[in-house]
């Protein structure tokens, strides 16, 4: 599973976003791969998209099968890991959606699709392993 971050979702919905072209190009590279959106990321994205029109683009993309909305942390009963991760990185003031994504990718077959450099340079798994990214960050 490739878990999409809000930075990517905003860029996919808002063509005026500086990263919109890169998001579309990367989406094309993911054809045939399963993309997921977590509820915390969906909530964060909803608030970042400033107009109803942009939110409608997101909803239609999800309804059209662009990604599935899932709750992987709850499915693995790993919410406690999210709290531990937030405590571990509290000096960096991470948001809940980022913590949730990191814990969601504890499974070896998953990665995060993001433009947020903290996933490459700051955030780590609870065991200290690097967070797996769907694409290298520029």
Predicted segments, located by residue:
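Short, well-structured N-terminal submotif of metal-dependent ribonuclease cores
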Residues: 1-37, 49-62, 138
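Active-site-proximal, substrate-binding regions of enzyme catalytic domains
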Residues: 10, 46-74, 78-84
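Hydrophobic residues within well-ordered alpha-helices
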Residues: 5, 45, 105-106
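Active-site neighborhoods of divalent-metal-dependent phosphate/nucleic-acid chemistry enzymes
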Residues: 71-117
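Acidic, PIN/NYN-like endoribonuclease modules and their adjacent C-terminal/linker elements
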Residues: 1, 71, 108-138
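Short active-site oxyanion
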Residues: 31-35, 67-69, 107-111
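A generic structural signal for short hydrophobic patches within well-formed alpha-helices
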Residues: 9, 42, 119-120
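Conserved glycosyltransferase catalytic-site signature
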Residues: 6, 39, 95-99
